[in-house]
Each structure stands twice: as C-alpha cells, then as structure tokens.
Amino acid sequence: MDLFEYQAKELFAKHNVPTTPGRVTDTAEDAKAIAEEIGKPVMVKAQVKVGGRGKAGGVKYAATADDAFTHAQNILGLDIKGHVVKKLLVAEASDIAEEYYISFLLDRANRTYLAMCSVEGGVEIEEVAATKPDRLARIPVDATKGVDEAFAREIAEKGHLPAEVLDAAAVTIAKLWEVFVGEDATLVEVNPLVRTPDDQILALDGKVTLDANADFRHPEHAEFEDRDATDPLELKAKENDLNYVKLDGQVGIIGNGAGLVMSTLDVVAYAGEKHNGVKPANFLDIGGGASAEVMANGLDVILNDSQVKSVFVNVFGGITACDAVANGIVKALEILGEEANKPLVVRLDGNRVEEGRKILADANHPLVVLAQTMDEGADKAAELANK
C-alpha cells in the first residue's frame, strides 16, 4: 500500500525521524488557519501518490497565511497525472543549504534489502542514476544485522554526503531503517533529505510503501487505506479477506489457488474470442476455503459488478473436497436469494468430484450450469456472457 506524504510523515514522527511540523487538510480555509498556527512561511503541498507535483503546480511556497489560502484554492482539484488533488499538507517551510537522497527498499532481483544514497537530492533519482551513476550509492543491507548508526554513517559516506554532516545524517538514516523494518515497508524514501544552514538534517518529503502481507501485524495501518481511490468492489472483497482484483471483462471468475485462477483467466479470454471478444471480469482466489460464507461473499462481490454477465466457478478439489465446494455453492445461492441473478457455470474436478457434481445436479438451481472440463466451462461462460 502506497502512502500519501502526510501519512509517511506520521510514521516518521512515530520513529523520531526529524521533519517539519504541519497538518493535512481538504479546504483552503483550514490551510490558512494551519499557516496562522505555524506562524512562519509554509509549503502548501498536494497530496497525491505520484511524482512530479512541483512541476505540475502542486507544491507552493506561502510567505503568509493569505498566500496559503490562495495556493490551496488553486491546488485543490488540480489534476496531476490523472490524480485529482483532494488533500493538502501545509507544513513549515525550511531553509535549505543542501539536498540529499536516501531510501531503503526490497531488492527482489537480488533477494536482499538495499540502501540507496546520493548527495544529488531534490531531483528525480532516475535522472541521477542515468546521468551521474557514480553519485548514487547502492549498498546491500544484511537483514540479520540491520542498520545501526555506524552502518548508516557508512551509507551516507558512500553517498558522498559532506563529512561535517555524516554523524547527523547517520542518526536520521538509522531511524529511517527503523521505519522500514518496524512498519514492514517495502520502500522508505526521502527526497529531499535536507541540510539546513545550521547543519540540521530534516526529511522534507517522504514516500512509504507498506507490505500488505504484513497487515495482520499492523491493524493500525488500516487507517491509511485510501478508500476514495480504491475500487468499491475491491474494498468489499478485502473486508471479507478475499483475494480479488477487478478487471474489465464480462465473465466473473472464482477459483481456488492463484495458479488455477490465472489459468482460468487465460482460458476464458481465449474462449471469448469466439464470443464477440468477451473477457474475464476479475481475479478471485478463494484459496483453500470454499465454505458457504466464503462462496457467498465471493459471489456477492462479483454479482455486484455491473459488467459481469456470467460467472465461471472453476475448482479443483484437494484438501477442500468437491462435495464441500458444491454444498458451499448451494448454500451461497440460498443466502444470496434474488441477488444471485446471473448464470453460474461450475466446473469441479479432483477429490470427491462425483459427489460434488451430484449435489449440484440434485439442487437443480436454474442459474447453475455444470461443465465437465475447464475448456467447456470457459466456453459456456463466455457464450452466456455474450447473450
């Protein structure tokens, strides 16, 4: 989960990373009030999860509270690379002597953590990597050892930070590592990390990506969810612990196991070529649990997608046997009642498949169509979606 800057700075404050005071708001009037409270010049910053805010006019210096009001009026509603500004961060402006770059990230290619540091901050780091690669240090981090102040100083030194700020920078870099590990992040980035005229080190910006797989360890992270930007169906699925991704097709997909669901998407897309270009409407993996409740929740999400014209349930029985899946489908249809109003093609295979098919056949639900193979099921679901 990508965070807004103001949310990243909340985590920075939690771990004592030095930054500038400020508050988030969604009105120009409140922006003025915050500037008055701070009592000094402020920065009015658009809160969007995309780079290039400054070039797009989304970051402005305000010498007075009235300036903050005017800038807030202009920035709210601004479209920055397809992201409409709905919130602003009003933060105390800082005198800047130098700008640096620091980040910690998960280096998937090398299966390790990576620190990146550069004396060339305040610009796109990709530009530095392309034009001045020798100015960008990449330092692997041993997960078993982490980053203490001594190693943080080494990171700063390799990033060519001036000798007179190495100690202060090391303290901040070590605290940023605490954010990275303590919050189960996959990215913590500060650009710029600034040196003030009196040699303070401040995180003026912040970018944090949290690992959703660690949400169970951080219930407090739920408050960071951007509900306005999240598809309501994906939000509903997440609330029910369903692994769901919305796509742009007409055939709803339910399967058990990510590999089977991915294969089902391919087979449905192929079958759809014969039926006016019908495509899969979603990815939905119910995993090993096909209880009535899980199946009902999955169907509820898919059937609430107005684009869906048919549903293909493709399950291979293993630990969860096919008869349990079939009972789950029957009970789910009972639970949903009239909300279940689209044809449901079901293909079962594997453990206790005959018993599962018999349960569905005996139920004789008017919406349920049985298929013997995945290809047959995909073709039938695509055909029904094209009617």
UniProtKB/Swiss-Prot annotation:
One of its GO terms (molecular function) is succinate-CoA ligase (ADP-forming) activity. It is an enzyme of class 6 (ligase). Pathway: Carbohydrate metabolism; tricarboxylic acid cycle; succinate from succinyl-CoA (ligase route): step 1/1. Residues 9-236 form the ATP-grasp domain. InterPro entries: ATP-grasp (IPR011761), ATP-grasp_succ-CoA_synth-type (IPR013650), ATP_grasp_subdomain_1 (IPR013815), Succ-CoA_synthase_bsu_CS (IPR017866), SUCC_ACL_C (IPR005811), Succ_CoA_ligase-like_bsu (IPR005809), Succinyl-CoA_synth-like (IPR016102). Binds 1 Mg(2+) ion per subunit. PANTHER family: SUCCINATE--COA LIGASE [GDP-FORMING] SUBUNIT BETA, MITOCHONDRIAL, SUCCINYL-COA SYNTHETASE BETA CHAIN. Succinyl-CoA synthetase functions in the citric acid cycle (TCA), coupling the hydrolysis of succinyl-CoA to the synthesis of either ATP or GTP and thus represents the only step of substrate-level phosphorylation in the TCA. The beta subunit provides nucleotide specificity of the enzyme and binds the substrate succinate, while the binding sites for coenzyme A and phosphate are found in the alpha subunit. HAMAP family: Succ_CoA_beta. This is Succinate--CoA ligase [ADP-forming] subunit beta.
